[in-house]
Swiss-Prot record:
Family matches, as InterPro entries: LolA/LolB/LppX (IPR029046), OM_lipoprot_LolB (IPR004565)
GO BP terms, alphabetized: lipoprotein localization to outer membrane; protein transport
Membrane topology annotation: Lipid-anchor
This protein's name: Outer-membrane lipoprotein LolB
Organism: Shewanella sp. (strain MR-7)
NCBIfam families per UniProt: lolB
Lipid modification (N-palmitoyl cysteine), residues: 26
Quaternary structure (record): Monomer.
Length: 214
């Protein structure tokens, strides 16, 4: 059995335990830092954030839909996929130098989160670039293909790998004082990912009150 089949079989076995999968609220991870919700004028100002939403992955052989929770900072990424009933399907805990993936009662480790996901699942998911795209930003290796009538980026192409990733920003929404994507689609060959951000919250260090010691 190849990596993709084994990965999706593990996920669907978890889903079967909790009944039919719907896309609803997400189970969140406990905070691991002293970050607090903040308001920003632009998503580029948010060095950390957390989101709750939906993820759908499609290949010619398989389809997967799950709830997504992601807490991102410059030092750490914590990502969880769950079913509607809160059953945890997958957790990923990554730093710039290490990654730990837990799925189906098994633990996998690597020095790179993107390499780890590809090794276990067979999918080349661009986990390193997603934090930029999720917030509607264009990376240094991204090429803008089209913009909408307001001049906002509509579609970009990233050619770090071949075939390239094509990212389409389907709709936008106001969150935490900034405008971020609501739905986006990622395509690379016959692999398609769809993301929906139901809630996006910018995070930052809490302000020090007058008279308090830092």
């Amino acid at each position: 059995m190849n990596n993709l089949k084994r990965f999706t079989k593990s996920i669907f076995s978890c889903i079967a335990l909790s009944g039919l999968l719907f896309l609803g609220g997400c189970e969140t991870l406990p905070p691991t830092t002293d970050l607090s919700p903040i308001t920003v004028d632009n998503a580029t100002q948010a060095k950390a954030w957390e989101l709750q939403g939906k993820l759908a992955i499609r290949t010619p052989q398989d389809k997967l839909s799950a709830n997504l929770y992601w807490r991102h900072s410059e030092e750490r990424d914590e990502l969880t996929l769950t079913t509607m009933l809160g059953t945890t399907v997958l957790t990923l805990d990554a730093t710039p130098n290490s990654a730990h993936l837990h799925i189906d009662g098994k633990d996998f480790r690597d020095s790179n989160a993107q390499a780890l996901l590809e090794r276990v699942s067979g999918w080349s998911i661009p986990i390193n670039d997603l934090p930029l795209w999720i917030t509607g930003q264009v990376g240094g290796l991204d090429r803008v293909i089209t913009v909408d009538s307001n001049g906002k980026t509509k579609q970009i192409q990233n050619s770090q790998t071949l075939p390239p990733w094509v990212v389409t920003f389907l709709s936008w929404q106001p969150q935490s004082g900034a405008e971020v994507p609501y739905q986006l689609k990622l395509e690379r060959g016959d692999l398609q990912l769809k993301l929906q951000l139901n809630q996006w919250q910018a995070l930052g260090k809490p302000s020090i009150l007058l008279g308090e010691k830092p």
